[in-house]
Amino acid sequence: MHFPNTKTSCWTKALAVLAVVSSPVMMGQEGIPDGVWVRPGFELSVAESSIKKPRFLEFDDRGTLYVSVPNKGMINACRDNDGDGAYESLTTYVEGYESGKILQAMQFYKGWLWFADMTGIYKSQDSNHDGNADEVIKVVGEDQLPITGGGHKWRAMLIHNDVIYTHVGDQTNATDEPIMENDRKKIWTFNLDGSGKALFATGIRNTEELCIRPGTDEIWGVDHDIDTLGLKLESKHPKFGQPITDHNPPAELNHYVKGGFYGHPYILGKNMPNLNFLDHPDLIEMASKNVIPEWVMPAHCSGNG
């Protein structure tokens, strides 16, 4: 998620996320999910409740809230016309993208709403401000982007300082292959016109959203780590379930830097070797190159934003 205004946007977007949640949950007073609260001095209300299974949010410079809905292959545009905190106007901004192609990533940048799915990276405009895109341009084509078969197909996209950053995760849980075997598990960069493809970082399993740390040029993201850390041990003792895998490895909050290697699938968390690759001849060398996470989170928590 991109936060252009470091003073207010983090709170605005965080509250908006809660406001548009529309999954079937226990609802408390005024439609707020039970257990959801905000700090003293803040107030939480429902801004829009009709969008089902929203994914990511983005604001433009006129206050329009865009909501990606991957299972519908569409983006909705929400407008608060009277300033009361609720969105009276809901339109379909773009539609017709295959649900299996996972339209999710969005960013408003230099007058255009950029978005991405498995087929490409696009930029769009609503020149007459009616809530519907009247111009959509494919900037980066499918032939330039990582292949998208298998799992972890959520394309991340970030634009900063006129550079496009994009990532698609590992096609399996932990694919053992040479680093440059394919374009996945990496962050790639492009110029704003789609030219100049360049490698930025490697060893990334599945970072579904890339962010700029407010007030800096730093690129951050949460990487969702593997699901079978203890497989070789636990499969021999099925009656014990998954005592290792249920709690390991941690999800990683990473600061992504140019040329950085982030360990996947061989090195996990704070330089812990993947138990499934203990016989790999380059394990120690890869550990020496691994960029240590800035922070670790509980296993399988799948954090974003």
Which residue ranges define each predicted feature?
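A detector of repeated loop/turn-to-beta-strand junctions in beta-rich toroidal repeat architectures
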Residues: 72, 87, 118, 133, ...
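Short loop/turn segments immediately following beta-strands, especially the blade-tip
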Residues: 78-85, 124-132, 258-262
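Beta-rich, blade/repeat-based domains predominating
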Residues: 50-62, 96-112, 116, 146-163, ...
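Beta-propeller domain segments
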Residues: 30-40, 154, 171-174, 185, ...
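Conserved beta-strand positions in repeat-built beta-propeller and related beta-rich domains
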Residues: 59, 67-71, 115-119, 166-171, ...
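Asp-box/WD-like beta-propeller blade repeats and closely related beta-sheet repeat scaffolds
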Residues: 90, 101, 119-160, 170-172, ...
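A short loop-to-beta-strand structural motif that recurs across blades of beta-propeller domains
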Residues: 74-77, 120-122, 186-188, 252
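Beta-propeller domains
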Residues: 66-86
